[in-house]
């Protein structure tokens, strides 16, 4: 996201559409995002903690920011794909062209399709297979009465952190399709057939 945003114009910057203020995961995502953005030189024009991760709330807030900041919005960090969809809807309604870079998380099907059409820049994919393999390993150890250890402890809970994967238009086939998370048939519905062909998917 930081590498992709073009915020060289004076006064330009980004919006941060964070997750729900009552979700502890959202607080971690927000802290992690700030740990990168704050040292990047990007200016945060405004940020919003989205109640209930509600895309309509995200859309409403971004609409207000478009009215206030207009063409100064060079990018939108969204904490998940639902809020990214809300942000993009606001940008579309306001006829913002070209669209600023918008990110998301969760590799939702609608987000993959928005990436194909160029509406969304990327999403964060957390592969299921490594999570399942690690969970199975822990379950087997517990079943055998073995002690389970982890390299980290987060809020008093032993934890192993797995690497998330950034998915852009260039690596849809090598990530979510290769892992069977989504199939080509899932992604390339008639409405997205041309975009799939242009991206070499299918």
Task: Annotate each PLM feature.
Residues 1-202:
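A residue-level marker of the well-folded mature domains of exported/periplasmic proteins
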